[in-house]
């Protein structure tokens, strides 16, 4: 039997692939099994020093993601002997990654694409796993899709269960059981009672913070380095644009040190003031990689140290976003920015430091399979890369 801790992108596809190959699987999920429309209620809360977007529930942060699917860190992973080209092809076909049909490209997104093209920025449609036949174009992706029109880890968990996997939710790992440098099982709390589950193969897919905290329970000092992708949203007024109800982040500009994507932020109207309403805002997310100078405290709080480059790259991206907005017809006098936030934490148990190229730790049979293992910050949505790494691990475990 394989025990998988967590059901986000990594754990979900791993469970599905193993179960479909008749490998006994038990998934232990700290959060609840929920409907996608309720995912907004399961965002995690961190200390006041950092605004980091993650969720704890079935499917993990995929439930509140924009379903953006871009390849990332190809060269960096290849340096560790990891070539994901076949796995990328497999996953992209499996979840039907594509740029949205024009029917689902709203007016604000089209203005972004056209303005960026005029400025020579080579915009493209964002590769996504959203299914137009179900999508109602409500702009609520980050709150949990009300009609289940995007891919989430929950979809793969359900398939795993259909193929015989056991799913235990609202269960928190309290310890790992090891013997002679080998994994032997896990201890967890369910309904206030500690239980033990034995296995010679345990895979931690609890996210960069959760997996690192579990590793610390057996003396593996993970989480002393941590990245997340810093971002701000820059926006201004175009009266009655109604961008806030469009499919978000449906376009993409890839710069040298940042990425830009049209994204409505509810914080923008208050930053602008006056009579600006949500329906009047066109805004752009500016996202960059960071230099992995964050870390986790003993109780899992996140501390982020901003470097000069972190701030410089965000400023560069924000300036370019301003040019795009003005070209798109935004009144430049109304342009404002949100505060700094973060998404996609990772690097807490990186390949080459805590796991090998097969994602196995120094403890035989104990693997890590989530953004923890990414060697550097991608500065892009990492879900597709995690899915590809997980498919590779599934093939390895199946043998």
What is the role of each PLM region?
Residues 384-399:
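An active-site-proximal "capping" alpha-helix that borders the catalytic cofactor pocket
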Residues 218-319, 323, 361-362, 371-375:
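FAD cofactor-binding and catalytic pocket of flavoenzymes
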Residues 136-200:
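Helical element adjacent to the flavin cofactor pocket in flavoenzyme catalytic cores
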Residues 94-99, 123-163, 300-306:
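Helix-loop-beta segment of a Rossmann-like dinucleotide-binding subdomain
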Residues 2-27, 32-34:
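N-terminal Rossmann-like FAD-binding beta1-loop-alpha1 element of flavoenzymes
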Residues 20, 24, 31-34, 39-41, ...:
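Glycine-rich loop(s) and the adjacent beta-strand/alpha-helix scaffold that form part
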Residues 137, 141-144, 316-379, 383-387:
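A glycine-rich dinucleotide-binding beta-alpha-beta segment and adjacent secondary-structure elements
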Residues 62-64, 68-136:
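Rossmann-like flavin
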